[in-house]
């Protein structure tokens, strides 16, 4: 196997050694964990709540279906899945601070019995093959170092007939709105982050990471190469975000 330790990868618009990205991403989310939900409201003007509602509905929650929620963060997807009638959830995140927030929310909503929590790297899941019905990742894939590996791991742990879902910021498809979107992302958002969270740099990184993430067709191709079948995607809000899905058949 080739030594990739000296390779560089993107971290926003910067490049860093491959081995450093995980640490730097962890620092970002340590910083924003307590205000993560506010951050999502700022980045999407609150529309992320509608996107997540559609995302979970597409997963078709059923009591007999199990969910692995990758980069589960503050628990939004896991809790929505349970509220919609889904079965047991394992919520994972590489960042322990984020999981603590998610656990607290689950306790507040009296749904702690339905969720397991694990600090785990989506690139090397500590799970056996073919063990879950659904795998989800929402606003997390762009922060992973090796996205191809995450997709391969998601497929590995899915049962035959299982389905993978990804909700992520993507490429705006409305050209006339692009100048305003750029100004919002790179001028307004970091300024708001500095004022609300006293953390301009983290919000700057998050805006940059969106632009560096593969576009809709590129991500669909990556999923097919990982072995997913019947891959499709749905644009949300003109392509500001997109839901991708693929089956393990």
Curated annotation (Swiss-Prot):
| Family designation | Belongs to the class I-like SAM-binding methyltransferase superfamily. MenG/UbiE family.
User: What Enzyme Commission number does this protein have?
Assistant: 2.1.1.163, 2.1.1.201
Residue positions binding S-adenosyl-L-methionine: 74, 93, 121-122
PANTHER family associated with the record: 2-METHOXY-6-POLYPRENYL-1,4-BENZOQUINOL METHYLASE, MITOCHONDRIAL (PTHR43591:SF24), METHYLTRANSFERASE (PTHR43591)
For this UniProt record, give its keywords in alphabetical order, as a comma-separated list: Menaquinone biosynthesis, Methyltransferase, S-adenosyl-L-methionine, Transferase, Ubiquinone biosynthesis
InterPro entries associated with the record = SAM-dependent_MTases_sf, UbiE/COQ5_MeTrFase, UbiE/COQ5_MeTrFase_CS
Q: What class of enzyme is it?
A: transferase
- Metabolic or biological pathway, per its Swiss-Prot or TrEMBL entry: Quinol/quinone metabolism; menaquinone biosynthesis; menaquinol from 1,4-dihydroxy-2-naphthoate: step 2/2; Cofactor biosynthesis; ubiquinone biosynthesis
Reactions the enzyme catalyzes:
a 2-demethylmenaquinol + S-adenosyl-L-methionine = a menaquinol + S-adenosyl-L-homocysteine + H(+); a 2-methoxy-6-(all-trans-polyprenyl)benzene-1,4-diol + S-adenosyl-L-methionine = a 5-methoxy-2-methyl-3-(all-trans-polyprenyl)benzene-1,4-diol + S-adenosyl-L-homocysteine + H(+)
What Gene3D superfamilies does its record include? Vaccinia Virus protein VP39
Pfam (any one): Ubie_methyltran
What GO molecular function terms would the record report? 2-methoxy-6-polyprenyl-1,4-benzoquinol methyltransferase activity; demethylmenaquinone methyltransferase activity
Q: Which domain of life is it from?
A: Bacteria
* Species of the source: Acidiphilium cryptum (strain JF-5)
Name of the molecule in the record: Ubiquinone/menaquinone biosynthesis C-methyltransferase UbiE
Function, in words:
Methyltransferase required for the conversion of demethylmenaquinol (DMKH2) to menaquinol (MKH2) and the conversion of 2-polyprenyl-6-methoxy-1,4-benzoquinol (DDMQH2) to 2-polyprenyl-3-methyl-6-methoxy-1,4-benzoquinol (DMQH2).
HAMAP family, alphabetically? Answer: MenG_UbiE_methyltr
**Protein's GO biological process:** aerobic respiration; menaquinone biosynthetic process; methylation
